[in-house]
Amino acid sequence: MRSSEGAPSWAVALPPPLRPCAYGVSEVTRCWHQLSLGAGESSMNPSATLYRRQNIGSEVETSTIEKQRKELQLLIGELKDRDKELNDMVAVHQRQLLSWEEDRQKVLTLEERCSKLEGELHKRTDIIKSLMKKVKTLESNQAECQTALQKTQQQLQEMAQKATHSTLLSEDLEARNENLSSTLVDLSAQVGQLQAREQALTTMIKLKDKDIIEAVNHISDCSGKFKLLEHALRDAKMAETCVVREKQDYKQKLKALRIEVNKLKEDLNEKTTENNEQREEIIRLKQEKSCLHDELIFTVEREKRKDELLDIAKSKQDRTNSELQNLRQIYVKQQSDLQFLNFNIESSQELIQIHGLKMEEPKALECSKDMCLSDLDNNYPKIDIKRERNQKSLVKDQTFEVMLAQHNGSDKSSCDACREKKLQVNTALGEKSVIALSSLFTKDLLDKQKSWSLGGKIQTEPENKVTLCKVHAKSPKCDGVGLPTEEKQLSETSVSLSDEKQWHDINVYLGLSSCSKQPDRLDGDGHDRTGTSEVSCCTPNVVCIGDNDLSESKCCHPSNIIIEAPGHMTDTEWMNIFKPSRAQRIVRHKTMCTCSRSVSAMKYNSSASELIGMQPSQCVGSLKSAEREEESAALPDRRTSANEKDDFSPTSKLQRLLAESRQMVTDLELSTLLPISCENLNRSKLEVSEEPDEKTTLVSH
């Protein structure tokens, strides 16, 4: 498993790949001991040996991490296959149980049916036996009945013969009676006819005598009537002449009356037309009266509404002014906090540089060895560090994400400077200051007071991809004071981990750990502020990289981060800040860290809904091109899955709250324009109401 200890440091064999189940941190510490023992011969060049050890340790760690990832992926695939097989087995077993229960129920039902049918069969057999007995008795009765029938049939035949003789005799007697009755009818009919003729003759004679007497009397009456009619004719002729004369007179009178009636009709038509015109004028006047009344009412209401709108606009203006003053005060506080943070960072860097000049190289080597071993043995937990005076400060952002832009790297940063800073941090400071970036969210801006809550949110891409990471910067002191400080920090983690579960206060920690910087200053014009860049953070105890790899490994030291805060601003600029813009403000990092753990964390925990705890790791040199291509191909797929999960995450809720707060600010800004718009609406309504009035007047005319 291990190579010989006496071999030179250049020929030290690397340990085989470590499995996560069989090997752990202790095996890595053994490897480091082996490397330290093998490097005893080359004590003449401590900087070169330290550099080689760090490179070898980083390669070992990267190889173990990659193999552990592959094994974990294989184990996860096997577990998924086993889970599918178990699910299939359970489904088949459940189906068999269901079929068995169905068959059992069917058998029980069939047994019940069989028992019922057997009982019915016994009953039917008893009934059949009783019926057989009845059939036998009926057969005996039937035989007796047949004998009685034969006797009765013989008696019936005898009676039928007697009946035939009696019917023949009765027929002969009936024929004789019919002949006698017909003769009697003929004789009676002849007698009746003769009597009727006698009566008719006597009545005819009497009627003829009466007719003769009546005719004589009628002739005498008619002669008298003719005389009277002649006298009446004379009188009628005289009356007719008089009537003709009167008729002519009446005709003349009728013509005169018709002429008068026509004249009266013409007068009546003229009067009706005049009456209709007067009615139309009355209706038009009534309409004008109603329109004038409505206009008066509208004018009164318009004046009232104008007064109300003016009052509302004044109150809204006062509200907006007060809210803008509060926003400005908060923004000024944030700016002062940022300036204080920058001052703390500069002072800490100066202290680090001054202390690094005083330190000596052998102490640096011993401290680096102890540091590496302690970092590998200790699995750093996530610590929610409280705000203290000169160590920590909270930067509050009111309605938008804190813009992290590029910062000009120092020209004199190199591997030696990083090492000196690390030693100074290990010996002098003990604990690093942490910048907690949090965003404040507004709730009920119009009705309630503004309640701001801390929530960490760094927007890294324009597609609203948010990566939240925690970097805990800790380093034990070289002079033996590191152990009690680490125990204190572990006691603080137990309290902070319970607080980290609350999603409403999400703290984003960026460690002030020493890391390798690029000696050449990056051009600010070369990087787009609107381009997409992911924020990745390095942890403490990071080993410097060679000069050839500095162009590829860009570290995420807090000195590379700029928090831009504007100075004095006008009202329009303040309103433009709080407007929801299409181009989202983007957190952009100047350099891209190549920490192996940070890359893995960004690969596997790219969703914005999860807090990514970054464990301490060492910066790796130039990665192989094949591995980078695989990582670049795997990142977009995971980002798409992260976007699907992002809708249900607490960070998405925070983004929605930010959007709502921005919308409220825009509504407050637009509320000042309400009186003008209301007046325009009232004018348009009045114009629309005046147009139908004009149409009604035209129709009435």
From Swiss-Prot:
Chain intervals with Basic and acidic residues compositional bias: 636-648
A GO molecular-function descriptor: transcription coactivator activity
Motif segment (LXXLL motif 1): 654-658
Compartments where found: Cytoplasm; Nucleus; Cytoplasmic vesicle, Secretory vesicle, Acrosome
Coiled-coil segments: 61-197, 241-342
GO cellular component term of the entry, any: nucleus
Tissues where this protein is expressed: Highly expressed in testis, not detected in other tissues (at protein level). Expressed at low levels in the epididymis, lung, spleen, bladder, kidney, liver, muscle.
Motif (LXXLL motif 2): 670-674
Domain text: Contains 2 Leu-Xaa-Xaa-Leu-Leu (LXXLL) motifs. The first one is essential for the association with ESR1 and ESR2.
Listed name of the protein: Coiled-coil domain-containing protein 62
Native species: Mus musculus
Lineage, opening ranks: Eukaryota, Metazoa, Chordata, Craniata, Vertebrata
